[in-house]
Amino acid sequence: MIGWLKGDVQHRDQKGSRNLVLIACGGVGYDVQLIERDWQAVSTDQRHEFWIHQVVSADNLQLFGFLQLAERDLFRELIQVSGVGPQAGLALLNACAYKELVTALVHSDLKTLCRAKGVGKRTAERLALELRTRLTDSVASTGPERNQLDPVAPDLIATLETLGFETHEIRDALQRLNGMGGPQDGDDDDAWLRACIKLMSSTDP
């Protein structure tokens, strides 16, 4: 099973409500469907990494990609609910930001859930009922601070990459910072940028 891809985006396309990219990786081109905000964030002829969920059927193989691991994992939770397929899962993530969606599921905010295309009241009720307990820990702290389940802005990662840091070490630094409660001098992107650079520089040989 494919769980992660890193490669150059060769082509971007929209077919109806589907946001598609062609990723060149190891001499192979992979068609991957993204949520709209991720599709807007990527550019052709640039290297990106995607967390992948693979769906295999008798006559088809589909890849769904996410820039953030937390969103890929939430997508997997969503499509485990009876009656919720991959397109409905993507619609939910398109309609709501990650934390807003988790909060809506935990608090049974049916109005928010029904904003997603193709999600009616009964499906929203079933989603909230089945996922509430599993996702409660994700919103245990609802303060303004970031927590490790919040997706980090792609532009922060991109900025660090332009400074010469590798993606894997950036994500490791972000995870370590989350475990430390975040930067000590603020919670804006500049604070996270400074803290990541300091942390990664201190671990250089």
Swiss-Prot record:
* Keyword annotations of the record: Cytoplasm, DNA damage, DNA recombination, DNA repair, DNA-binding
Family, as annotated: Belongs to the RuvA family.
> So what does this one do?
The RuvA-RuvB-RuvC complex processes Holliday junction (HJ) DNA during genetic recombination and DNA repair, while the RuvA-RuvB complex plays an important role in the rescue of blocked DNA replication forks via replication fork reversal (RFR). RuvA specifically binds to HJ cruciform DNA, conferring on it an open structure. The RuvB hexamer acts as an ATP-dependent pump, pulling dsDNA into and through the RuvAB complex. HJ branch migration allows RuvC to scan DNA until it finds its consensus sequence, where it cleaves and resolves the cruciform DNA.
Q: Is Disulfide bond among this UniProt entry's keywords?
A: no
This chain's protein is named Holliday junction branch migration complex subunit RuvA
A GO molecular function term, named singly, is: ATP binding
Region Domain I, annotated ranges: 1-67
Q: Where is it localised?
A: Cytoplasm
Which terms does the UniProt entry file under GO BP? Answer: DNA recombination; DNA repair
Region of interest called Domain II, as start-end residue ranges on this chain? 68-146
Q: Which GO cellular component terms, listed alphabetically, does the Swiss-Prot or TrEMBL entry include? A: cytoplasm; Holliday junction helicase complex; Holliday junction resolvase complex
Q: What NCBIfam families does the entry give?
A: ruvA
Which stretches does the entry tag as region Domain III?
A: 155-205
What assembly does the database describe for this protein? Homotetramer. Forms an RuvA(8)-RuvB(12)-Holliday junction (HJ) complex. HJ DNA is sandwiched between 2 RuvA tetramers; dsDNA enters through RuvA and exits via RuvB. An RuvB hexamer assembles on each DNA strand where it exits the tetramer. Each RuvB hexamer is contacted by two RuvA subunits (via domain III) on 2 adjacent RuvB subunits; this complex drives branch migration. In the full resolvosome a probable DNA-RuvA(4)-RuvB(12)-RuvC(2) complex forms which resolves the HJ.
Domain note: Has three domains with a flexible linker between the domains II and III and assumes an 'L' shape. Domain III is highly mobile and contacts RuvB.
For region Flexible linker, the annotated ranges are: 147-155
